[in-house]
Amino acid sequence: MKVLLTNDDGFHANGIKVLKEIVMAAGIASEIWVVAPLSNCSGCGRSVGLRHAIEVYKVSDTEFIVNSTPSTTMFLGLKEIVGEKPDLVLSGINSGVNIGNDVTYSGTIAAAAEAAMMSIPSIAISQEYDGRSGEINWENPRKFLKGIVDMLLGAPSWDKSTVMSVNFPLISAKGIKFTSQGKYMPYNKIEKKKNAASSISYTIHRTAPDKDSRGESDDSIRALDDGYVTITPLKFDMTDFDILESLMLLNEGCNI
């Protein structure tokens, strides 16, 4: 099986190195490629590089660095770099979870979505970490990821245009739960600084809200807080079909 690894934290991030170690140790791939951004692109969502030259650096025959966003990196990886399309794309392991409303900001999920648009099985992988110490424990992915990949690839109901988003908790995981995305808006602290000139600079700091305000029992937010690995299927047709149906009924009675 040909597996393509990518991320949004950058080619030199620890998470993608750990991911490659896990894939190699699991023996699930006969061919492993790494195509990742040059620098950290956290929070860039599905932004793309247009109308300017994008440099690609060859590290080895199967490892490449792209000086662009995760979505662009994946697009070029699939269209120009890896040749025959991979059997699986793994995006991560992201430093920090991608849950609730954060999924639309996530470059990790965006890279996986780019592959899913081409009907390639794609899994976005994220690891919660201690925001105070900054330490990341990779034991949960090492323990659970192979089994999760095997299980998902064997799922006949998996529409390959759907991204599977896997989030690992900070503590030793109790098990796995399939969950909904949930609603989660992190607390944003804005630091304001007046510069010597006439400009003002702002720094936005993102922190998690109190756990009591974080989610329902069946969503990824609450399940993570309870110590479970969460698996959430994400589709990127963002149409609200309930509202669409009501608007279509409304339109029937209008003379516009």
Curated annotation (Swiss-Prot):
EC number assigned by the record: 3.1.3.5
Needed co-factor(s): a divalent metal cation
Membrane found in the keyword field: no
Organism, as annotated: Ehrlichia chaffeensis (strain ATCC CRL-10679 / Arkansas)
Catalytic activity: a ribonucleoside 5'-phosphate + H2O = a ribonucleoside + phosphate
Subcellular location: Cytoplasm
Residues that hold a divalent metal cation according to the record: 8-9, 42, 94
GO MF annotation, one: metal ion binding
Protein name in UniProt: 5'-nucleotidase SurE
Keyword Nucleotide-binding appears in the UniProt entry: yes
Pfam families (alphabetical): SurE (PF01975)
GO cellular component terms given for this protein: cytoplasm
The family this protein is said to belong to: Belongs to the SurE nucleotidase family.
Cited InterPro entries: SurE, SurE-like_Pase/nucleotidase, SurE-like_sf
Record's cofactor remark: Binds 1 divalent metal cation per subunit.
Role: Nucleotidase that shows phosphatase activity on nucleoside 5'-monophosphates.
Protein keywords: Cytoplasm, Hydrolase, Metal-binding, Nucleotide-binding
